[in-house]
Amino acid sequence: MLCLGIESSCDETALALVEDGRLLHSVLSTQADMHALFGGVVPELASREHYRYIGPLFDELMRRSDKSNEEIDLVAVARGPGLLGSLLVGVAFAKGLAFSLGARFLGVNHLQAHLLAAGLEQPLKFPALGLLVSGGHTHLYRMETPWNCLPLGRTLDDAAGEAFDKVGKVLGLAYPGGRLMDALAGEGRADGIAFPRPYLDNDNLDFSFSGLKTAASTYVQQHFAGMTWPRPLGSTAAAPQELKDCCAAFNLAVVDTLCTKATRALDRNPQLKYLILAGGVACNSLLRQRVTELMERRGGQAIIPGPHLCTDNAAMIAYAGWLLGKEGYYHQLNMETVPRGRALPDDMRRCREYAEDLSET
């Protein structure tokens, strides 16, 4: 089965083709440089850029893949959560394409796709603990199957990735700040600054990073007054050691918090021997190291995709669509988009006859 995946939930316009679980080709247009001028994503500009590039990117993808449009069996698209205007561009394009080709149509949960992205590189193993850490979400899931994920904990205010970007902005780092903060942290010492580990004085599995963000911002205002470095800072070369140390301490506080909650979830679910790490913050080198060590100590395994599959991409949408499509799942063309802040409805339909036919081929 050939599945086209379309991703337009935020500021990346991306399309990919997955055939029988294998990535054939992917194309992407990023808006990072444009939004960096404003210090964050401007929703109206994001949706206009998606509209501008989605058609040409589809044409480019099909040329590279040496596939014809008529060979597409399933069109999968990120339906949410995300920015409403951005989602609408991708969903409208996907619906029109599926209708014109007579292909099946499927709306994919953007968060679920992140959790499944590692399957493009290595076998996914279940049941597993899913730790999704991105700019908009910090969630824990009990994953019984690729399409059966039980929420265990969620972000109550600022997500980890959002905290990285906002503190990076206070520090004068180029947007988005998370990647550069990771690099700066690698050259700093974390033991000189005692940032709090937020929301650990309870027995639940939810996250809250607003207090840590405020603590870091206050520290910068109190200790970095009068200090100068190039702004926006785009590399580690011109950064003073004090800045590197601050990034190291903040980075460690975030990672400690994530790993503490993950450990708590594993202790309560001892049958979970695998941990799937996903989302843009899964690119963080310290987080990848600590999660790997955590699972090794417990005799389990950490499943972590390559950094190129952690950030928003269409390969994960196409792969999630293929996994669901081969089980016979699909949506009707009146499916709605679901912006951030709303729960995705369980409205997929299933054609069991199609799934049985597919399993025999």
UniProtKB/Swiss-Prot annotation:
Task: Spell out the reaction equation it catalyses.
Answer: L-threonylcarbamoyladenylate + adenosine(37) in tRNA = N(6)-L-threonylcarbamoyladenosine(37) in tRNA + AMP + H(+)
Kindly give the InterPro entries that the UniProt entry links to this protein: ATPase_NBD (IPR043129), Gcp-like_dom (IPR000905), KAE1/TsaD (IPR017861), TsaD (IPR022450)
Any one cellular component term from GO for this entry? Answer: cytoplasm
Q: What class of enzyme is it?
A: transferase
Name its cellular compartments.
Answer: Cytoplasm
Q: Which cofactor does it need?
A: Fe(2+)
Instruction: Detail which positions bind substrate.
Output: L132, V133, S134, G135, G136, D165, G178, D182, N284
Amino acids binding Fe cation: H110, H114, D312
Instruction: Give me the comment on cofactor binding.
Output: Binds 1 Fe(2+) ion per subunit.
**Which Pfam families does its entry note?**
TsaD
Q: Which UniProt keywords apply?
A: Acyltransferase, Cytoplasm, Iron, Metal-binding, Transferase, tRNA processing
Q: Name one GO biological process term.
A: tRNA threonylcarbamoyladenosine modification
Coarsely, its chief localization is: cytoplasm
Query: What GO annotations for molecular function exist for this entry?
Result: iron ion binding; N(6)-L-threonylcarbamoyladenine synthase activity
Enzyme Commission designation: 2.3.1.234
This molecule's function is given as: Required for the formation of a threonylcarbamoyl group on adenosine at position 37 (t(6)A37) in tRNAs that read codons beginning with adenine. Is involved in the transfer of the threonylcarbamoyl moiety of threonylcarbamoyl-AMP (TC-AMP) to the N6 group of A37, together with TsaE and TsaB. TsaD likely plays a direct catalytic role in this reaction.
Q: Which PANTHER family match?
A: TRNA N6-ADENOSINE THREONYLCARBAMOYLTRANSFERASE (PTHR11735), TRNA N6-ADENOSINE THREONYLCARBAMOYLTRANSFERASE, MITOCHONDRIAL (PTHR11735:SF6)
Q: What family does the entry list? A: Belongs to the KAE1 / TsaD family.
- Protein name (Swiss-Prot/TrEMBL): tRNA N6-adenosine threonylcarbamoyltransferase
The uppermost taxa in this organism's lineage are: Bacteria, Pseudomonadati, Thermodesulfobacteriota, Desulfovibrionia, Desulfovibrionales
Q: Which gene encodes it?
A: tsaD
